[in-house]
Amino acid sequence: MATPASITNVTVEFLQFPALVTPPGSTKSYFLGGAGVRGLNIQEEFVKFTGIGVYLEDKAVSSLAAKWKGKSAAELLDSLDFYRDIIKGPFEKLIRGSKLRTLDGREYVRKVSENCVAHMQSVGTYSDEEEKAIEEFRNAFKDQNFPPGSTVFYKQSPTGTLGQLIFSKDETIPEHEHAVIDNKPLSEAVLETMIGEIPVSPALKESLATRFHQFFKELEANPNIEN
């Protein structure tokens, strides 16, 4: 992967996203691909709700570099295919969504699931199985309330498990998952709605492009870096 010097922390409002995270009970670390704010324009004011960070398995850099090295940060930012390669890439992802203001679990998951359903319908991947998965997804959040600083973690496998939906009172990763949902279209849709064609966090997309451009440059300069 990229050298440790290039994998820096990111601050989003009062939230700190460390360069590396290691879940409890695991020997595997994930590096921070990028982080940014999610918000909405409400009555001509941009209201910030969440800070989102995307962590990836080590081999993500070399996997993506095969196609994207040599591109500028601006070229990466303008390429939907780059983000789709992150979304569909053969490496694990750990997504952290930490709240900047209090959010009710039902209201939060209603909007997230609506965005996911809209995407899956637009690309023709929404069927009875996905409808069931969406219901599981909504049920996982129904009794939750998220005060500022609390976090939802989504751990995604290359096989499509949106698993290990993990809820935390702060930024630490609890040892036990809250729910596991085995549905690849939904798993991909969750990240698609964050960084895809209609992203809820343009700032996260920009962060990913800027940081991966640097990762690729370092990989080219140091081709013997382990992945």
UniProtKB/Swiss-Prot annotation:
Reaction catalyzed: a chalcone = a flavanone
Binding site for substrate: T50, N115, T193
UniProt keywords, alphabetically: Flavonoid biosynthesis, Isomerase
EC number from the UniProt entry: 5.5.1.6
Site feature location: Important for catalytic activity: Y108
Top EC class of this enzyme: isomerase
SUPFAM superfamilies given in the database record: Chalcone isomerase (SSF54626)
Residues spanning the signal sequence: none
Keyword Transcription: no
InterPro entries according to UniProt: CFI (IPR044164), Chalcone_isomerase (IPR016087), Chalcone_isomerase_3-sand (IPR016088), Chalcone_isomerase_bundle_sf (IPR016089), Chalcone_isomerase_sf (IPR036298)
Gene Ontology molecular function terms on file: chalcone isomerase activity
Keyword Isomerase attached: yes
Pathway: Secondary metabolite biosynthesis; flavonoid biosynthesis
Gene Ontology biological process terms in this record: flavonoid biosynthetic process
Function: Catalyzes the intramolecular cyclization of bicyclic chalcones into tricyclic (S)-flavanones. Responsible for the isomerization of 4,2',4',6'-tetrahydroxychalcone (also termed chalcone) into naringenin.
Family, similarity comment: Belongs to the chalcone isomerase family.
Miscellaneous notes: Part of the biosynthetic pathway for all classes of flavonoids, a large class of secondary plant metabolites, many of which are brightly colored.
Record's protein name: Chalcone--flavanone isomerase 2-B
Organism: Glycine max (Soybean)
